[in-house]
């Protein structure tokens, strides 16, 4: 998989996680464990995107 393709896939994953976080947060009683897990995963995806961008330069 090329770097661009990997970055595109990570961007999609990041957007999907953001959507899931928003959905969970808007529930009447959001599950804090789920929110924490989703936010950690989103951060990992963001860090991977930054790492790939740095390598591509």
What would you call each of these model-derived segments?
Residues 1-57:
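Extended, charge-rich alpha-helical interface modules
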């Amino acid at each position: 998989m090329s770097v661009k393709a990997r970055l595109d896939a990570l961007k999609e994953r990041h957007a999907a996680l953001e959507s899931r976080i928003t959905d969970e947060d808007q529930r009447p009683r959001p599950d804090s464990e789920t929110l924490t897990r989703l936010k950690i995963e989103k951060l990992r995806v963001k860090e991977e995107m930054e790492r790939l961008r740095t390598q591509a330069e």
